[in-house]
Amino acid sequence: MVRLREIPRTATFTWSPGSAAPFIATGTRAGAVDADFSNETFLELWNLDLDNDKLGQELEPVAKISTESGFHDIAWAESEDHTRGVIAGALENGSLDLWDADKLLNGASDALISSASKHTGPIKALQFNPRHSNLLATGGGKGELFISDLNNVDQAFRLGSGAARVDDIECLDWNKKVPHILVTGSSAGFVTVWDVKTKKESLTLNNLGRKAVSAVAWDPEKPTKLITSIPLETDPLILVWDLRNSNAPERVLRGHESGVLSLSWCAQDPDLLLSCGKDNRTICWNPQTGNAYGEFPVVTNWTFQTRWNPHNPNMFATASFDGKIVVQTIQNTRQDASQAGNNQEQAVNDEDFFAKAQTRPQISTFSLPKAPKWLERPVTASFGFGGRVVSAGLSSGSRSSKITISHFDVDPNVGSATENFESSVKTGDFRGICESRIASSQCEEEKTDWKVIETLLSDNPRKQLVNYLGFSNEVDEAADSLSKLGLDKKEANGEGQLSPKSEGVKKHKRITSIFETNVEGESFLDEIASSKGAKTNNPFQIYTGSESEADRAITRALLLGQFEKALDVCLQEDRMSDAFMVAVCGGQKCIEKAQEAYFSKQSEGPSFVRLLASVVGKNLWDVVHNAGLANWKEAIAAICTFADDKEFPDLCEALGDRLEESYRSKKAKQARKDASFCYLASSKLEKVVSIWIQELKENEAYSIQNATDDTSFSIHVRALQSFIEKVTVFRHVSKFQDPERQKSSDWKLSSLYEKYLEYADVVASHGRLDVAEKYLDLLPASYPEAEVARSRIQFATKKPASKAATGRAPAPRHPPTAPTLTGTFQPAQIPTHKGPAPGSVNQFAPPALSKPTNPYAPTTTTSYTSAGGTTYTPTTGYQPPQPRQSNVIPPPQPLAPPPQSGPAGLAPPPRASSQSPSVAAPYTRATNIPAWNDLPEGFGRAATPRRSTPVTGSSVISSPFPNTPSLTQPGSHTSPPPSTMPAPRDSVPPPPPKGPAPPRMASPSTAGIPHGLQPAERPPSRTHVYSPPLAQQTSPGMAVPPPIPRGPSPYNAPPTVPPPTNRYAPAQVSQPTGQLHGQPPIAPPPHSSMPPPPGPYAPQPFQQAPAQSPYAPPPTGPQAPPPPVSQQGSRPSTAQSQKKAPPAQKYPPGDRSHIPANAQPIYEILSSDMQRVKARAPAAFKAQVNDTERRLNILFDHLNNEDLLQPSTIESMAELAHAIQVKDYETAQAIHLDILTNKTDECGNWMVGVKRLIGMSRATP
């Protein structure tokens, strides 16, 4: 707990009343001796000054006045006549003194209000009535108990008679619910309840055989419950009484080691009680249950008084005889604990331990298990995602809260508008949407946009656009007006005055005939052709003689079919009408030549000629770039009429760009509106969106300025809704496909994406999560601002990730072959065993030689290292067993019972194989021998025992020879994983680097198990690849893996750890004690304990015959160990083998909000199945089920923090979860084994939980 302030006084104290800044009044404790042996007594006021952040500092009094005697008790209460209240002191000389607190603070000399001496002895206790602050009760020697009225202190009346009691009243307390009830406690052990109204005793309690009472306290809420304490060293008890049964205490609180001197029951929370006493301790209790929450920092002397702050119970004060009153909080920041830990660690390493031990700060050893009652909210509410409001309130008549989840709309119109629009979109009624928006639009720009969008819905949108622009009837009207006009003969013949020839117009790149669709020209020629052979009455002459030379040249050219020469003559003579007539007969080339000549001549002519040239030359870009913007409608009409489909969008966009540039330069909104029309016609969403966003802001600002009762949020949401509706309908009409959804940056529609994201947030906050998800799907996958929104939507809707691995084939049921390691030693080859044969020698029978041989030792005599210090490198033909997690398959039992005597040895490991060995049937299904992490007995339905059928080439077979463990065929490449068999060893090698050796005793996991029923031990999750497993007690007929040092487990007790040995001390070799120096390689060992392994890196101190190394020849006798030698295959250095501290987790345990999408199926399926199992599991297996759930939570924490598990492992776990979900437990077990075999580094305690869940789920109906 945090020490806020310290008052350097040995004094009784009281808190200031009211909610103002807290003060403490102190009176020198009667009978206490100061450090300077002064006999002066003072009343002092202290300002705690909690606004100052200097914690634990000693204070100076702000007011001080001398008194005639020391204090036994002091009280401070509010008063109507005194601003800061009245302070009452119970003095040792029997005087009751009252002071004005305000005058004391101001330093006035008349601060003493009155001094009364009704008591004949010292006043031991006093207290103001909590309901009537003018009433003051005082108790003292000889059983004197007075009730005083501050309005007339001299007229105090006494309760009880003087002759009845001769003991002293040590404490008293007013009832907190019934103001006229008072309780007193005396030194003779009487606890008396008084009725002040009647001035009589109501009840007397026998305090546990009349033991002295040091403190009493009423329950702040229940008027019939009180607590008393005993100050005796022999009975340091706190008694809880219920007056409805006063014969015996309801509860006894035991925790103090010496007498209890003071009690303080928290007025704001009846579940908190403070006590202090002669054992220098202050303890916090729950008096309702009798449990002690813990104790506060211990001081060096008696703590004789403790008090909660009456207004702010977050802090309290405790006075002790070490000369300090400590003000501290009940909340702990843990800062002091860390500092104290550093100081303690420093003191341990220092020589002057006892010197520093006294200065070491005491720290709190507990935290409150629940929040105090004053921090509990009677009602609370919180807005949740998706338009939800979570509220909690107290149920009537109880402290239990009722949680309610309800829906909330910030603006109800948002939800209705969204629903109506989305329903119209689903039905495809886009024309109805446009019509309703046109009718409801309030600004002209909005209405124009919807009209254009409606026009685009027609079957011929380009024609409808021309009609919308007003060009549908203008041509007919112009033709009618011209027909009414009279034209002269020359104009009618097309021979009007032409402007001089100009060279301002260049030849167009692409020229086509303007007469290609001229119906009148075609009919004219048809009429001429049809007159062939007909008799006419209109004769003519080809040459009249009056024609010009040009006419003759034209005639001759026509007669010879030389239309091009005739055309040239016409053009030279400037006879354009004749030239066009000749060009019609001369073909396309002549027509183009005539057109070019015409346009060149008419470059300065009427504007329609320029337009006609653009149309004929299919060069509408000239109209787009050069036509005046005042005639943009005419330009867009020409584009709609003559442009081909490929150029149409680009032409409209270019015209819109010119209009928008005009808007930017002249700030003319009409130009922006016209540009919007062009962009809509061109279906250029990225261009029109920027204009619509500008209009959205302007319309929103205008609406806010003229709003009467709408909020700014509602206005903004309506404008945003209108924008989204226009974009959505326009996308449908134009069949827009966003080509940039796969890009990672530089999006053209980034402004639209922002609005989509904002709209999704708005509709999601109104509970329309499906609509929000729809618009979020329109954003690019790599849009960074959408990641949070997508994850919130997905979490709120509980949808699995899109990439859930459900369609993949199940994982193989056999792990791949472990890699073969190459070493420097070449062991002898193991003879190939293919079964018994007549006359064959049993190679596994115990040899007749007394001197054993090592099948894995080199064939030639080489130098060796001493036992216990052997270093080696694995060879090509054999890999040491790798550490594994679970699913260890022990070898089956031998066919014949083994002998109980004879030399012992361990079976050699199986040979390495280039193929993956098949997984045999689980051991627990083949036999009744439980493994360490199997389902508890009786959890599932009992399986019908049957004889398993061996699988060719994969199952483990028993040895046909007696007295031998079973082996697989070495040459079949189907041996089980190396970790299922123990390594060959005759000695006890050093344990893994971390952790000292276990004691000289049998492994806790195997002690007490009958022979042949030893379960396989779980190896540690991580160890070095060259660290050999430790030796283990073995049983006859079965090769059991050695014990592994491991952490606490719910299935066995942790081993006792002896002190570490000197890692560099030489081995202490002792003489053999009647046993051979070595053992046979195969013979079963006797049932005995192995000697304990040494500490890390220390040579083995032998207590029995020196055992040989599996990679060195056996010694012939006791040898002195050589000095340590560094070899290639030696154990890594200490620094390398030290286990690194686990990294700090990003998120607290239990948090599931950050599980990635690809891991969501794992969490959802496994947690759901765990709850199903938990609900149906038998009560006898509650502990196992809870442990499985705890281990699964470890997995979920890893997934939430995105650590430990690789993406491939998460994918495999998703397949496993899916297999559990569809009840394909065989596949789930195969995937589990595959992960366990190939990804050992990622497995931990959680993997055991997954295995158990598979079994429990299978057994649970």
UniProtKB/Swiss-Prot annotation:
Residues 852-879, 912-922, 1100-1110, 1135-1148 have a biased composition (Low complexity). InterPro entries: Sec16_Sec23-bd (IPR024298), SEC31-like (IPR040251), SRA1/Sec31 (IPR009917), WD40/YVTN_repeat-like_dom_sf (IPR015943), WD40_repeat_dom_sf (IPR036322), WD40_rpt (IPR001680). GO terms for biological process: COPII-coated vesicle cargo loading; endoplasmic reticulum organization; protein transport. Residues 946-974 have a biased composition (Polar residues). Residues 797-1156 are annotated as: Disordered. GO terms for cellular component: COPII vesicle coat; endoplasmic reticulum exit site; endoplasmic reticulum membrane. Residues 889-911, 975-1001, 1039-1061, 1081-1099, 1111-1125 have a biased composition (Pro residues). WD repeats lie at residues 5-47, 66-109, 118-158, 164-204, 208-251, 255-295, 298-338, 382-406. Its main location: membrane. Keywords: Cytoplasmic vesicle, Endoplasmic reticulum, ER-Golgi transport, Membrane, Protein transport, Repeat, Transport, WD repeat. It is a peripheral membrane protein. It is found in: Cytoplasmic vesicle, COPII-coated vesicle membrane; Endoplasmic reticulum membrane. SUPFAM superfamilies: WD40 repeat-like (SSF50978). GO terms for molecular function: structural molecule activity. It comes from the Eukaryota. PROSITE patterns: WD_REPEATS_2 (PS50082), WD_REPEATS_REGION (PS50294). Component of the coat protein complex II (COPII) which promotes the formation of transport vesicles from the endoplasmic reticulum (ER). The coat has two main functions, the physical deformation of the endoplasmic reticulum membrane into vesicles and the selection of cargo molecules. Belongs to the WD repeat SEC31 family. The COPII coat is composed of at least 5 proteins: the SEC23/24 complex, the SEC13/31 complex, and the protein SAR1. SEC13 and SEC31 make a 2:2 tetramer that forms the edge element of the COPII outer coat. The tetramer self-assembles in multiple copies to form the complete polyhedral cage. Interacts (via WD 8) with SEC13. This is Protein transport protein SEC31. It comes from Coccidioides immitis (strain RS).
